[in-house]
A protein has these predicted regions:
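Short, solvent-exposed loop/turn segments at secondary-structure junctions
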Residues: 52-53, 96-99, 133
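Charged phosphate-binding loop/patch that engages nucleotide di/tri-phosphates or the phosphate backbone
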Residues: 2-15, 20, 160-186
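Mg2+/Mn2+-dependent nuclease catalytic core
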Residues: 92-115, 119
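Acidic-basic catalytic patches of nuclease active cores, encompassing PD-(D/E)XK
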Residues: 1-2, 8-66
Length: 186
């Protein structure tokens, strides 16, 4: 568009084609909602514990949190129960196409998943390689095996292909990751 003073108006696209689908967290929330509605499993996203320091009260309805901080480091993103077993997992996305950087998952989260496994629960991570449009489930025992036997700072995609489990996308549930637990014999 040309304005009277000759300056061209540039329009910037607000749409990104780098992630055309929904993000991983939304896909998992939709899947978990499907599992809940159909009485398959009860799995919830854990709230992140915060302490509120400052609130702007324009009115009771329009209160806005202006300043807050995390109370404690969060453990993992999701937990629940499936077929009488406690499950706990973390979800992560990466734009990398060759590996998953280990700095994307915190040490305390890995320690938490190790404890879940030690006590008979099912722990895993779900990793989406966004540019490849591939989502993998990697059980904590396979993650521990990798960490104990490698000095790398990232997990190569080849490790996910060999030891992880691809999660196929569908309509309902969007990501049927519980099918992988069934295949493992949970």
């Amino acid at each position: 568009m040309r304005y009277p003073n000759g300056i061209k108006k540039e329009y910037k696209s607000i749409h990104s084609h780098s992630n055309r689908g929904m993000n991983l967290e939304q896909d998992l929330n939709d899947s978990n909602n499907y599992y809940l509605i159909n009485d398959i499993a009860i799995i919830y996203k854990k709230p992140t514990p915060i302490t509120i320091n400052k609130v702007d009260y324009k009115s009771r309805v329009d209160a806005v949190i202006k300043e807050a901080h995390f109370k404690t480091p969060s453990t993992t993103d999701y937990n629940g129960i499936y077929k009488g077993k406690y499950i706990d997992f973390e979800d992560k996305e990466t734009k990398n196409t060759t590996s998953f950087p280990l700095n994307n998952i915190h040490k305390h989260q890995i320690e938490h998943l190790k404890k879940i496994y030690k006590h008979g629960g099912i722990g895993f991570i779900i990793v989406r390689f966004t540019k490849l449009n591939k989502t993998y489930l990697l059980f904590i025992e396979d993650l521990i095996n990798f960490l104990n036997n490698n000095e790398r700072v990232s997990i190569p995609i080849s490790y996910f292909k060999e030891f992880g489990h691809i999660i196929k996308e569908g309509l309902n549930p969007r990501l049927d990751y519980l099918k992988i637990l069934d295949q493992k014999g949970v």
